[in-house]
Design a protein with these regions (language model features):
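Short, C-terminally biased terminal segments at protein or domain edges
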Residues: 1-128
Length: 128
């Protein structure tokens, strides 16, 4: 689903779509094997990936670009948190290098896309 307009719904925002994929990837590895039994790490990383998604949705309903960008920055921080936590999963051999690379890169892509959207909002008066 590639939608170029974002006025109608948070689901239209490409950054949210990427964060959703990040969350899907995180859950796919976190709910299996030894990773699933490491409740602390599993809960932290699934919450962080979900937060990347949910903050975009929450900010979308804000009343101003400034408020929206605040939540978008929270989303970016959550992406960075996933990147840090996925190192722990790799170091504990819960995941393969290939899985690490996919999740790390998805978090980086999401972070960058959300950053571009922040710049757009800061330079566009009332885009909605």
């Amino acid at each position: 689903m590639k939608i170029t307009r974002f006025e109608d719904s948070f689901e239209d925002i490409e950054g949210w779509q990427l964060a959703r994929e990040l969350t899907r990837q995180v859950y796919a590895v976190a709910m299996r094997g030894a990773f699933a039994k490491d409740f602390g790490l599993r809960d932290q990383i699934t919450r962080a990936s979900g937060s990347a998604m949910h903050n975009i949705a929450e900010g979308f309903d804000g009343g101003s670009n400034a408020e929206f960008t605040k939540f978008l920055r929270y989303s970016q921080r959550s992406c960075s948190e996933v990147q840090s936590q996925i190192y722990v999963a790799l170091d504990q051999t819960y995941i393969t290098q290939e899985e690490f690379d996919a999740i790390y890169n998805q978090a980086a892509l999401t972070h960058a896309k959300v950053g571009g959207f922040i710049r757009y909002l800061l330079n566009t008066p009332n885009p909605r």
